Amino acid sequence: MCGIIGIVSKNRVVDRLLDGLENLEYRGYDSAGIATVNNSEIVYSKSTGKLVCLKNKLKQSPIDGNIGIGHTRWATHGEPIETNAHPHVTKNVAVVHNGIIENFAEFKDGLLEKGINFESQTDTEVIAKLVEEKISKEKREPLEAVRLTVEKLRGSFALCFIFRGHENLMLASRRGSPLALGFGNAENFVS
């Protein structure tokens, strides 16, 4: 069980992501993290432990952006260590995930055979690498890359993505897990 949140806004989102994660903290105490797109680049911070650990880390090394995703983790795949914390980030994509991907091992094996390395023990990093491959090698646009990846996944999950070079694009997908969308005045939310 994990908690995920995403915000696209005309205003800065980091404090609001942290507020949202505070409301979701009961869904995971093992680690927390956020990612934003700032000046077209993905920036992120994550830490083990409760949300207060991430907040303290961000006081030392702040990040900024008007679009972002966040996650609190209750470990299901992999130990509660920082490399397993979400978001999982590649060159072009950051993803947070709640749920279980039942067939992640077969995709991971295929990616390893192609020489793609993994840092974590999570099923979520596999999703990030699959979407990255579709964007960077197959030259797919983010929506198509996510759609083609998600249609192959088995399990119950909710996902939220942001992308390098796309300061107004957040994509979310779900299968079997709840995911709420919120539409505001010049901002949108997912959780």
Model feature map: region roles:
Residues 1-191:
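Conserved short alpha-helical segments that host acidic/polar catalytic motifs at enzyme active sites
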